[in-house]
Swiss-Prot record:
InterPro entries, sorted: DXP_reductoisomerase, DXP_reductoisomerase_C, DXP_reductoisomerase_N, DXPR_C, DXPR_C_sf, NAD(P)-bd_dom_sf
Name of the gene this protein is made from: dxr
Protein name (Swiss-Prot/TrEMBL): 1-deoxy-D-xylulose 5-phosphate reductoisomerase
Names of the cofactor(s): Mg(2+); Mn(2+)
Residues annotated for Mn(2+) binding in this entry: 162, 164, 233
Transmembrane segments annotated in the record for this chain: none
Keywords in alphabetical order: Isoprene biosynthesis, Manganese, Metal-binding, NADP, Oxidoreductase
Family as reported in the entry's similarity comment: Belongs to the DXR family.
Function statement: Catalyzes the NADPH-dependent rearrangement and reduction of 1-deoxy-D-xylulose-5-phosphate (DXP) to 2-C-methyl-D-erythritol 4-phosphate (MEP).
Pathway: Isoprenoid biosynthesis; isopentenyl diphosphate biosynthesis via DXP pathway; isopentenyl diphosphate from 1-deoxy-D-xylulose 5-phosphate: step 1/6
Residues the record lists as binding NADPH: 25-28, 53, 136, 138, 217
Reactions the enzyme catalyzes: 2-C-methyl-D-erythritol 4-phosphate + NADP(+) = 1-deoxy-D-xylulose 5-phosphate + NADPH + H(+)
Organism, as annotated: Bradyrhizobium diazoefficiens (strain JCM 10833 / BCRC 13528 / IAM 13628 / NBRC 14792 / USDA 110)
Length: 407
């Protein structure tokens, strides 16, 4: 049984939905709070969490009368308590408090804590059978099989909040699993779509941060430029929808209007379209199984005029090939892929390596990990976190020689 509900069940909706937002002060959290703000009669806030932004967290807690808030940075606990003095909001700090937020009795949970730190709080929500809007990629990339099996066992409902996976989620409802031929994830191609590989190698940080369509954080914008983000999305789609690598294609679509497509056995292709605005997939998750009014701009296809497509270039973007390789290898390889990429991107931002070295460091780390015979099925959150830690250390150790080769 899948934890992703591919058939709409109208009986699942309730009049007033209690909501928890894990990562309320980040970009996804901000978009979620924007939607909650627009429909106060539909939602009640149970819990909110943040990493270290006390001011923003306290402000949200007061605005939405949150019952519980948690700050991950324990050094900020006293400041948070002082900011909420005189309110009825309970406060907590540290990893255990963030996990408690996920475990509290909310109907719907936005899992938007970034990094491996988001895995255990999301699992806390999953274990009590909540509706979980999943925006944390580590839950799937680092622990996909384990996470989805645990969700299905608990009767949790996993709602994909990422734009591409949400598009597939909507399109997959048009047929049955045995009728599916393939899913197609679209990619803008990023700022280097038409660049020569030699020029991409030398790309600067400023150039990598000029995304043509989306406004995102620094890390994900660089991942888009390298197409590592699309590799991560391929991995996520595999675990979310129980797909083999051969059932997942990537198609470059520079306009970012079609977010995902599904081909069925009768050769019908069902697509989801929309303006590039993260609030649209979040609104779909927040309203599910109903639809709520969203704030995104109305899609005007006549004004856009033309939608174009092209195959991805694996020479320009080797990170995409490595994602498929790691997915086929399995047994923790996707965790290594993600961890090595995070180390590589941080090194690029710090000026320690060239842009082209990002994929080389990921490949070197994967090869080193496979040679070491470390492949093993991940059966717990701690297993995933351990592999993530080992991979980061190996990537950091390999970094100097990768940087030297590129110089």
């Amino acid at each position: 049984m899948s934890a992703v509900p591919l058939r709409n069940n109208k009986a699942a909706a309730s009049a007033v939905r209690s909501v928890t937002v894990l990562g309320a002060t980040g970009s996804i959290g901000d978009s979620t709070m924007d939607l909650l703000r627009a429909s106060p009669e539909r939602y009640r806030v149970e819990a909110l969490t943040a990493n270290g932004n006390v001011e923003a967290l306290a402000k949200l807690a007061k605005e939405f009368s949150a019952r519980f808030v948690a700050i991950a940075d324990t050094s900020k606990f006293a400041e948070l308590k002082a900011a909420l003095a005189g309110t009825s909001t309970e406060c907590g700090a540290g990893e255990s408090a963030v996990i408690e937020a996920g475990a509290r009795p909310a109907d719907w949970v936005m899992a938007a804590v970034s990094g491996a730190a988001g895995l255990k709080p999301a699992l806390a929500a999953v274990d009590r059978g909540a509706h979980v809007a999943l925006a944390n990629k580590e839950c799937l990339v680092c622990a996909g099989d384990f996470f989805m099996q645990r969700a299905a066992k608990a009767g949790a409902c996993i709602l994909p909040a990422d734009s591409e996976h949400n598009a597939l989620f909507q399109a997959l409802g048009s047929g049955n699993r045995d009728e599916l031929v393939r899913v197609i994830i679209t990619a803008s191609g990023g700022p280097f779509r038409t660049w020569k590989p030699a020029d991409i190698e030398q790309a600067t940080l400023a150039q990598a941060l000029k995304h043509p369509n989306w406004s995102m954080g620094q890390k994900i914008t660089i991942d888009s430029a390298s197409m590592m983000n699309k590799g991560l999305e391929v991995i996520e789609a595999s675990y979310l929808f129980a797909l083999s690598p051969d059932e997942i294609d990537v198609l470059v679509h520079p306009q970012s209007i079609i977010h995902g497509m599904v081909e069925f056995s009768d050769r019908s292709v069902v697509a989801q379209l929309g303006s590039p605005d993260m609030r649209t997939p979040i609104a779909h998750c927040l309203g599910w199984p109903d639809r709520i009014k969203g704030p995104a701009a109305k899609l005007d296809l006549a004004k856009i005029g033309q939608l174009t497509f092209e195959a991805p270039d694996f020479e320009r973007f080797p990170g995409l090939r490595l994602a498929y390789d790691s997915l086929r290898t399995g047994k923790g390889a996707t965790t290594v892929y993600n961890a090595a990429n995070e180390v590589a991107v941080a090194a690029f931002i710090a000026g320690k390596i060239r842009f082209g070295a990002i994929a080389r460091l990921v490949e070197a780390t994967l090869e080193d990990w496979i040679r070491g015979g470390n492949q093993t099925p991940l059966t717990s959150a701690d297993d995933a976190i351990s592999v993530d830690h080992v991979a980061r250390n190996r990537a950091a150790a390999l970094l100097p020689q990768i940087a030297l080769k590129a110089s």
